[in-house]
């Protein structure tokens, strides 16, 4: 029906990755791009959802949400700010990874009850590695707080254009491995440790 819609029909196809759609579908579509919400709008959405954040939580969660009210709610409900801080703190020990800290964090994901947190961890690692690659190309982000621990990490790991490419490849590889591993019910603790070791290997090689 999407490729050959009936006469006088209007169909809405919503996609967060339109480039991944089949060309036969895209050629029949008129694009209507929806921009991300501003941080103020995300905060308003959280208030409407009766989710109240502290002054310390609010800026980080709205930034990590990337303009998505749904992602902001998810981050708030799953203590995403605390998980993000734990990841940044552990990765800040690179290129000589604190393996005890990595193991402790990985073991907190044992069991089926942590399935949603594991999905969130994948999203946060995607963000962290993506920002690391971006910083390798554009070292100074005028909107970022240079004193924040995550910004110090991105600056510490950036190694120019070559580093940007390597971090982007590591991000893609880790994301695929983690998502596939969960789909086939591999041990999340093992997957997370493997993730940390791959990141450590990349950091040591640059």
Where would I find each of the regions flagged by the language model?
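Charged, glycine-rich active-site and insertion segments that engage polyanionic ligands
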Residues: 7-10, 16-124, 131, 135-206
């Amino acid at each position: 029906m999407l490729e050959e819609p009936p006469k006088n029909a209007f169909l809405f196809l919503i996609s967060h990755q339109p480039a991944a759609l089949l060309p036969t579908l895209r050629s029949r579509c008129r694009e209507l791009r929806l921009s991300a919400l501003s941080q103020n709008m995300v905060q308003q959405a959280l208030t409407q959802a009766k989710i109240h954040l502290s002054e310390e939580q609010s800026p980080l969660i709205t930034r990590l949400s990337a303009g998505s009210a749904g992602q902001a709610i998810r981050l708030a409900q799953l203590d995403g700010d605390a998980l993000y801080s734990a990841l940044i703190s552990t990765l800040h020990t690179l290129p000589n990874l604190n393996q005890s800290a990595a193991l402790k964090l990985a073991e907190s994901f044992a069991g089926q009850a942590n399935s949603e947190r594991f999905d969130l961890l994948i999203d946060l690692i995607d963000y962290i590695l993506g920002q690391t690659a971006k910083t390798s190309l554009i070292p100074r982000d005028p909107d970022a707080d240079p004193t924040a621990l995550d910004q110090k990490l991105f600056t510490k790991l950036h190694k120019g254009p070559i580093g940007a490419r390597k971090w982007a490849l590591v991000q893609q590889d880790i994301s695929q491995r983690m998502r596939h591993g969960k789909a086939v019910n591999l041990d999340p603790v093992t997957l997370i440790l493997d993730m940390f070791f791959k990141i450590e290997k990349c950091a040591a090689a640059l």
